[in-house]
A protein has these predicted regions:
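N-terminal leader/targeting segments and the immediate start of mature chains
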Residues: 1-23
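Mature, soluble, non-transmembrane domains
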Residues: 11-13, 44, 48, 55-135
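Structural recognition of beta-strand segments within beta-rich domains
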Residues: 16-43
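Edge/loop elements at the starts and ends of beta-strands within beta-rich repeat scaffolds
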Residues: 2-5, 29-32, 49
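Short linear motifs in intrinsically disordered
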Residues: 1-4, 26-27, 102-109
């Protein structure tokens, strides 16, 4: 697994057609696992997963959320440090401010933790760091 600087808080905007949803994602180390907790702007949990030994596991009583799991996996790819990219994702391609895992994810960076993430069958996500300020 890549080395992430944790804990991390991100503002996620999900963009589909003319609809937009806003979420807050908290990524934190918990023993040998990384916990991913996503909530809406009112603080209501939307998805929670733990990543341990390269496997995703449901965390808590929330129903499975395949889209969130795909989003979390794509975010892990997007947040992987450049020096660790090839070891973790051998098929990945990096060109300047763009990083692609063919058939999976397309990331375009504005800044290190600020980027647009596109999935092949949609949706698009705009991701920016949260520095203690609500969006």
């Amino acid at each position: 697994l890549p080395n992430l600087t944790l804990p991390m808080q991100l503002h996620i905007q999900r963009l589909v057609a003319d609809q937009r949803q806003d979420w807050v994602l908290v990524i934190q180390q918990e023993g040998p696992a990384i916990r991913w907790s996503m909530m809406d702007l009112l603080g209501i949990p939307q998805a929670r997963q733990k990543l341990q030994d390269g496997e995703w596991h449901a965390d808590g009583l929330l129903p499975p959320n395949p889209e969130a799991r795909e989003l979390f996996a794509a975010l892990l790819f997007a947040l992987t440090p450049n020096a660790e990219l090839q070891a973790n994702y051998p098929a990945a391609q990096q060109h300047g401010a763009q990083r692609v895992l063919p058939e999976h994810w397309d990331v375009r960076y504005c800044a290190p933790n600020s980027f647009e993430l596109s999935l092949p069958k949609g949706p698009k996500y705009q991701v920016t760091p949260l520095n203690g300020d609500a969006p």
